[in-house]
C-alpha cells in the first residue's frame, strides 16, 4: 500500500505520496530532502514515533500505522540556511496584515451573536487540564507563534527558534499567575511545539491547560469582514471561580485576537528572524518585570497595556 504524508516546514506544507509501507523512515527523509533541500541527518521529524519513541531511520513506514495524509512537523536547516533565515516574511503574513483594533471593538465586543458563540464554546469545548487552577492566582494567557517562538525560520531544533528568556519568564510569571497557552493551530502542533521547547515538563513552572483553534470564534467586523479571535470569555465562563476580567492578561502578537476583550490584551512585539535577533530580543525579560508589578494589583481593568513600558519605567523610578 502507498503511504501519503504532509511535511510542515518553514511555514510551508509538502505532500509526499510516492512511498510504500515497505519503505523506511530514511526513504521518507530522502524524499523530504528532494523537496526541501534539508539533508536527512539534519531532519528531526516531530511526532513520528514507534512504541512511544522517535522512529529510527530503518523502521518501515508500514510499522508506524500512519493515517493517509498524516501531517508531520520537521525541524531542520539547509546547508545554505542563512539565506532562507534572513529572507523577509511573506507579505501576506498575519503580522503584516494585522490592524489596529480600537475602531472595531465597540462594534463586536457586546454583539449578541458573538456572545452566543462564546456561550457555545463554554458549553461544548473540552478543556484538558494539565494542572489544577490555583486559588488566588492571576491568569496569563500566551500565544505561541511569534510570541514565544519564531515559527517561520528554519533551524535544527526548536531551541534555536525559542524566544530569549522564555523559561526565565515562565518561571517568574508562575509565581503570581496560572499560565494558559492558546494558539490558533491544532492541539497536535501545540503539544509538539511545547515539548520541543521544553515547556511541557519543565520543573520550574506548570501549564494549567492549553487551548487550540477550536476554542476560537469568528466575528464580523465592519471594515475587515470575518476574522477569527480568541475570546477570553471562554475561559472565564468555564473557570468563573478563578478567572475574570479583573485578573487576566493575554499576550499575542496579533491585535485582532483581542477584539472581544481589548482591555485584557497586550500586543507583544513579534519575534522573527531568530538567528538575527536572538542576542538583542529582551521582550520577555522586560515583560516579566511588568507582570511582577501588576500582580500587586487586585484589578487590572484600570491598566492600559498598550503603554506597559511607560508604566514599568514609572514604577521602577519611584
Curated annotation (Swiss-Prot):
Residues given in the record as Mg(2+) binding sites: 143, 145, 253
CC terms in the record's Gene Ontology section: nucleus
Keywords: Hydrolase, Magnesium, Metal-binding, Nucleus, Protein phosphatase
TM regions (residue ranges): none
Signal peptide: none
Molecular function (Gene Ontology), one example: protein serine/threonine phosphatase activity
Domain FCP1 homology: 133-294
Protein name: Ubiquitin-like domain-containing CTD phosphatase 1
Lineage: Eukaryota, Metazoa, Chordata, Craniata, Vertebrata
Amino acid at each position: 500500500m502507498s503511504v501519503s504524508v504532509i511535511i510542515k516546514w518553514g511555514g510551508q506544507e509538502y505532500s509526499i505520496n510516492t512511498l510504500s509501507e515497505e519503505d523506511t523512515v530514511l526513504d521518507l527523509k530522502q524524499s523530504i530532502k528532494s523537496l526541501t533541500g534539508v539533508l536527512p541527518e539534519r531532519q528531526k521529524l516531530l511526532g513520528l514515533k514507534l512504541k512511544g519513541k522517535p522512529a529510527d531511520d530503518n523502521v518501515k513506514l508500514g510499522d508506524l500505522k500512519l493515517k493517509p495524509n498524516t501531517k508531520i512537523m520537521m525541524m531542520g536547516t539547509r546547508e545554505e540556511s542563512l539565506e532562507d533565515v534572513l529572507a523577509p516574511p511573506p507579505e501576506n503574513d498575519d503580522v503584516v496584515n494585522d490592524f489596529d483594533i480600537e475602531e472595531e471593538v465597540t462594534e463586536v465586543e457586546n454583539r449578541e451573536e458573538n456572545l452566543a458563540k462564546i456561550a457555545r464554546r463554554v458549553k461544548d469545548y473540552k478543556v484538558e487540564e494539565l494542572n489544577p487552577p490555583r486559588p488566588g492566582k492571576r491568569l496569563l494567557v500566551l500565544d505561541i507563534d511569534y510570541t514565544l517562538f519564531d515559527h517561520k525560520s528554519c533551524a535544527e531544533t526548536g531551541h534555536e527558534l525559542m524566544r530569549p528568556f522564555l523559561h526565565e519568564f515562565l518561571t517568574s510569571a508562575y509565581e503570581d499567575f496560572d499560565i494558559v497557552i492558546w494558539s490558533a493551530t491544532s492541539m497536535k502542533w501545540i503539544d509538539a511545539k511545547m515539548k520541543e521547547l521544553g515547556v511541557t515538563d519543565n520543573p520550574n513552572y506548570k501549564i494549567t491547560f492549553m487551548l487550540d483553534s477550536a476554542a476560537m470564534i469568528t466575528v464580523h467586523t465592519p471594515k475587515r469582514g470575518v476574522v477569527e479571535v480568541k475570546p477570553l470569555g471562554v475561559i472565564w465562563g468555564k473557570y468563573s471561580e478563578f478567572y475574570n476580567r479583573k485578573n487576566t492578561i493575554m499576550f499575542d502578537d496579533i491585535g485582532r485576537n483581542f477584539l472581544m476583550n481589548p482591555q485584557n490584551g497586550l500586543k507583544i512585539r513579534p519575534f522573527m528572524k531568530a538567528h538575527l535577533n536572538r542576542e538583542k530580543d529582551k521582550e520577555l525579560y522586560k515583560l516579566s518585570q511588568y507582570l511582577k508589578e501588576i500582580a500587586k494589583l487586585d484589578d487590572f481593568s484600570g491598566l492600559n497595556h498598550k503603554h506597559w513600558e511607560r508604566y514599568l519605567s514609572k514604577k521602577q523610578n519611584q
